[in-house]
Amino acid sequence: MQILSIDTSGQILSIAILKKDVIEISEYPSGKMNSEKILPEIKAMMSRLSINFSDLDGVAFGAGPGSFTGIRIASGIAYGIAYSLNIPIVGINTLEALATLIDNRHCISCIDARMSQVYIGAYQVNNLCITTINEPGLYDPEVLPDINFSEATIIGSGVITYKNQLAKKYKHINLNFIEKEFSLAGVIAKLALPKMNKNFNLDQAQPIYIRNKVAQTILERNSSK
């Protein structure tokens, strides 16, 4: 099976193609990319691998949470490709994708949500098998959710910004911090593979907008100026 994966939910834009057991990944600073530039990069990558769009068996994308604009771009491109080829599409939770990047079976995924807030989810991980312990949520860094792990790794862009608040809130946990932004398209492709279903419904793969009123709120602010 050959799967195209796109993630533009964070500061690193990544594109991946899973071809049998081999993953090819390309990364770019997301600030320099937009929807008009991504498609040519996808085409160039497929050309390097001698793959045509008609060879794809499915499309996956980082469904969020994360950058509202980035998620919208990735989902739009993924839907366009899936719809035109009539192939399955799968959206993968970016907090879950982060959790699979570490060896520790207890993970707290933490993504900087901007606007002085953070997205957090807690997971138990065994290879690519994920059990949700705390559902993903949007929090102020001073009012973080209770998480009852004895030890855990905290991973994601939110650690870079809010390490002190996280350390204070979870001082009862033996913590390992990973302060780094990750590209996720590769792991998203792997997570999407078992979810690809020939009896698919394009409407089932929806973006995860935890802060679902952000665009409207910004518009209202601008209108009031």
Name the predicted role of every residue range.
Residues 1-63, 182:
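N-terminal beta-alpha supersecondary unit
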Residues 58-88:
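DPxDG-like acidic metal-binding loop motif
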Residues 49-54, 147-150, 196:
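Glycine-rich phosphate-binding loop signature in dinucleotide/nucleotide-binding domains
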Residues 48-54, 83-94, 200:
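Phosphate-handling active-site elements
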Residues 30-33, 88-181, 209, 214:
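Surface "functional belts" at beta-alpha junctions
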Residues 29-40, 68-72, 76, 93, ...:
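Residues at secondary-structure transition points
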